[in-house]
Curated annotation (Swiss-Prot):
InterPro entries: ATP_PRibTrfase_cat (IPR013820), ATP_PRibTrfase_CS (IPR018198), ATP_PRibTrfase_HisG (IPR001348), ATP_PRibTrfase_HisG_short (IPR024893). This is ATP phosphoribosyltransferase. The lineage of its organism: Bacteria, Pseudomonadati, Pseudomonadota, Alphaproteobacteria, Hyphomicrobiales. GO terms for cellular component: cytoplasm. Catalyzes the condensation of ATP and 5-phosphoribose 1-diphosphate to form N'-(5'-phosphoribosyl)-ATP (PR-ATP). Has a crucial role in the pathway because the rate of histidine biosynthesis seems to be controlled primarily by regulation of HisG enzymatic activity. The keyword Kinase does not apply. SUPFAM superfamilies: Periplasmic binding protein-like II (SSF53850).
Amino acid sequence: MSVTLAFPSKGRLKENTLAVLEKAGYKVVLPDDDRNYRARVEGEDDLDILFLSASEIARKLGYGSVDLGVTGEDLVRETLAHADERVAIEAQLGFGHADVVVAVPEVWRDVTTMADLDDVAADFRQRHGRRLRIATKYWRLTQQFFSQKHGIQVYRIVESLGATEGAPAAGSADMIVDITSTGSTLRANRLKVLEDGIILRSQACLVSARRSHTSRRVEEIAARIRAGLEI
């Protein structure tokens, strides 16, 4: 029975993933045609490799249509409802670091914490006749963090289709929840991260589908990759 692995299809995530596999002793033989998104592992005929977008990898792991994959923890938590019941994070891989954060305009000088934001949200409707608008691509993580963790209920999520950090300046939102590596883009757009506004510290992870946990082969591959990370 073959094991299906899904890895990022391009860029530094792909390069770093292949380097992790090589350290674990898995040599991936790439196709000659760049439009071919399948590959094989030298000497491992039962391994089938797919190259997909990081978000598609998270979805397929949730469905159980791939056994192991490399993707960002932020995508796993955002894409999958009840993620821990559907997938398991086997290892953090040490690259692709980024934080999902709550950021507000710098001119909101009195707003530095989520408690301050709760006060603003409650007051916002009375002052402006509408709810506080939050631009984000991370609606699930935003709802969990605001409503469940901090008890903030009076807000509205505005779907972000472009550059989220530009939404407050454009007038389409009052604040944002977005992912950042260095914070430089937020600062360039005169936004600040709240002191307790880090929702998730994300990085690339090796993730397994829960429905594949009966497979010894999947466990063996995950263990070998973890061992390679310690070299």
